[in-house]
From Swiss-Prot:
Localisation per UniProt entry: Cell membrane
Claim: Cell membrane is one of the keywords in the record: yes
Cellular component GO terms, alphabetical: plasma membrane
Membrane topology annotation: Multi-pass membrane protein
Residue stretches spanning the membrane: 5-22, 37-56, 63-85, 90-112, 119-141, 151-173, 186-201
Chain coiled-coil ranges: none
Entry protein name: Uncharacterized protein AF_2401
Organism of this sequence: Archaeoglobus fulgidus (strain ATCC 49558 / DSM 4304 / JCM 9628 / NBRC 100126 / VC-16)
Main location: membrane
Keyword terms of this UniProt record: Cell membrane, Membrane, Transmembrane, Transmembrane helix
Disulfide bridge partners, by residue number: none
């Protein structure tokens, strides 16, 4: 239990309570208007949040309280604006309050790890992100209509659909799904560029439609080229050339080889480091012909961990890291079987 977080939460709750009760005495004016129910709800939620955060097992579920804290804080803020003579903001807030609650709640749910089963966890988070995208679409559509500003409804919906699709792909293994996850950052960057272009640059080119068309098609073409290139990209390693330079000329005592192999396997499985295991295997198989040695070590040399996508969710990192560990264990098992066939009495 991390008491510092609980103490911090209690301190923050006390500071807010003290300010709300004594603001007129301290500043000569009431800035924040909150009734007893709102004060009690806000302080209780803050203390509950810090209590959940202080317990490691319950820490992820603290995010469930975020939308409630946001709504209560927003209620107090806009009630204060209403009491200070800004009713228009209060009216707008009341119209979008439901969308804000749904958006914050679903977005918070997407970060929580509910189960260790990748498929179910990915479905829960992807569904939450989809709901967050729809609520943000309606929220920005309404705000754009009320204030007469350019709408961010479609970009916000597209952003959460990108997050939902890439999060859902975490449930599946394979090159295609790994490629989908790896494109998250690029797709979000393209979305940002298109949004900035549509809102800031395109209106300035209304009298030059040819330039606008050229820019739009250039963005589409570059995006297609980048995505298709990433999908087809593969890295080939010349194992024979790598191994030939590491074949030792002297035999090493068997006990030392076992120790080096065990250390190399542990370093690779737990940390993903190939070097200790590669060197140990090359030394152990010093009498094996280079082509055969290259074939044995090919799975290790060509192995690459699946990279974590940018802005990855905590549960998503856990799934990918666990999957990488299982893949490394399979590589070690495969190599060990080959070594046992090549080296007589290898398994003592």
């Amino acid at each position: 239990m991390r008491l510092n977080k609980l103490i911090s939460g209690l301190g923050l709750a006390f500071a807010i309570y003290f300010f709300l009760l004594n603001q007129e005495r301290l500043f000569g004016e009431v800035f924040v208007v909150a009734d007893e129910m709102q004060r009690a709800a806000l302080l209780t939620l803050i203390v509950a949040y810090s209590a959940l955060a202080s317990v490691e097992r319950l820490n992820p579920f603290r995010l469930v309280l975020v939308p409630f804290i946001l709504i209560v804080s927003s209620d107090i803020t806009f009630n204060s604006l209403l009491s200070h003579g800004y009713p228009q903001y209060f009216v707008v807030y009341q119209s979008v309050r439901g969308y804000i609650a749904i958006f914050s709640g679903s977005f918070a749910f997407s970060y929580i790890r509910f189960t260790d089963k990748p498929l179910y966890q990915s479905l829960i988070s992807a569904t939450s992100l989809g709901i967050a995208g729809l609520s943000s679409y309606y929220l920005f559509s309404y705000l754009s209509e009320v204030f007469g500003l350019p709408s961010l409804a479609l970009p916000s919906l597209a952003l959460f659909l990108i997050l939902a699709v890439t999060a859902l792909s975490t449930a599946f293994e394979g090159e295609v799904f790994q490629w989908i996850r790896s494109e998250r950052t690029f797709l979000m960057l393209v979305l940002f560029i298109l949004t900035f272009y549509t809102l800031a640059i395109k209106p300035q080119l209304s009298e030059r439609p040819g330039i606008a068309d050229f820019i739009e098609w250039s963005i589409v073409a570059l995006t297609f080229i980048k995505i298709s290139r990433d999908f087809r990209r593969s890295v080939e390693v010349d194992e024979r050339e790598f191994i030939a330079s590491h074949v030792p000329k002297e035999r090493v005592f068997r006990d030392r080889l076992y120790s080096e192999l065990e250390f190399g396997e542990k370093a690779f499985v737990e940390g993903g480091s190939k070097v200790p295991l590669t060197i140990a295997l090359v030394r152990a198989l010093s009498n094996v012909e280079a082509p055969k040695l290259a074939a044995i070590l090919a799975p290790l040399i060509s192995y690459e961990d699946e990279k974590l996508p940018a802005l990855s969710f905590p549960w998503e990192r856990r799934i990918i890291e666990s999957r990488n560990r299982r893949r490394r264990e399979k590589v070690v098992e495969r190599i060990r079987a080959e070594v046992m066939r090549e080296v007589k009495d290898f398994n003592r």
